[in-house]
Amino acid sequence: MATPTPRHQETPQETTERERCEQWTDELFRTSPMVRFMTKHLSLLDCNPLSPLRTASSSSHATASARAQPKLVIAPCPPSIAGGFSPSLRSEPTSESSILLCSNRIFSKAHLEDTLSHEMVHWFDHCRFLVDWSNLRHHACSEIRAASLSGDCGFVREWQRRNYGFKLQHQNCVKRRAVLSILANPACAGDRQKAEQTVDEVFQSCFGDTRPFDEIY
């Protein structure tokens, strides 16, 4: 996961982008129905993204130091991503996961809402189902759910990507986004055929699983 630039080393542009992302994030946690809903259901699983970090008094000093970072990390990123999910280590509670928000890749509050919601679905899956992220089928299932439920494949986002279409556009977008994510998994080794096959194998069951929603948002 990207590491935030120390504030005294930020360029003026990085400072502006970080502060804008921080403001939008605060506003979304107060006003976004989607973000508030996901926060509620993460909290029910003891994975509240806004809860205090663990301290050395509740863990070994080494472990606490290794994970001494906010649960919502705002930092500059490479051009290919807008956010990410960093799952907890196997030896840690699932609540010790974190979300990356790429301050230089978020172009609007709506984009941030979709990105944050996408990563919160991953966190929900990690807390609820104990996902093995090295298992391509597990990873594909969570990517399918996150792309489908978060708004990442909404009409406006697809139009902005210049993916024009109407028939099965949502499903096609979900598959495409899931395949791209699986390709980045070291267990896939960049094998597109393997990524596409894995997504196809789990698509129907995972696309139909809308938990914690009653239906697609």
Swiss-Prot record:
Its BP terms in the Gene Ontology are: mitochondrial protein processing; mitochondrial proton-transporting ATP synthase complex assembly
UniProt membrane topology term: Peripheral membrane protein
Q: Which GO terms describe its cellular component?
A: mitochondrial inner membrane
Q: Keywords on this record?
A: Hydrolase, Membrane, Metal-binding, Metalloprotease, Mitochondrion, Mitochondrion inner membrane, Protease
Q: Name one Pfam family in it.
A: Peptidase_M76
The job of this chain, per UniProt, is described as: Has a dual role in the assembly of mitochondrial ATPase. Acts as a protease that removes N-terminal residues of mitochondrial ATPase CF(0) subunit 6 at the intermembrane space side. Also involved in the correct assembly of the membrane-embedded ATPase CF(0) particle, probably mediating association of subunit 6 with the subunit 9 ring.
Enzyme superclass (EC): hydrolase
Q: E.C. number, please?
A: 3.4.24.-
| PANTHER family, A to Z | MITOCHONDRIAL INNER MEMBRANE PROTEASE (PTHR21711), MITOCHONDRIAL INNER MEMBRANE PROTEASE ATP23 HOMOLOG (PTHR21711:SF0)
Disordered: where is this region?
Answer: 1-21
Q: Where does this polypeptide localize?
A: Mitochondrion inner membrane
Spell out the Basic and acidic residues composition-biased ranges: 7-21
The species is: Mycosarcoma maydis (Corn smut fungus)
Q: Where is the active site?
A: E119
Which InterPro entries would you find in this protein's record?
Peptidase_M76_ATP23 (IPR019165)
Protein name, entry field = Mitochondrial inner membrane protease ATP23
- MF-aspect GO terms: metal ion binding; metalloendopeptidase activity
Taxonomic lineage from the root: Eukaryota, Fungi, Dikarya, Basidiomycota, Ustilaginomycotina
Tell me the protein family, please. Belongs to the peptidase M76 family.
Q: Which residues bind a divalent metal cation?
A: H118, H122
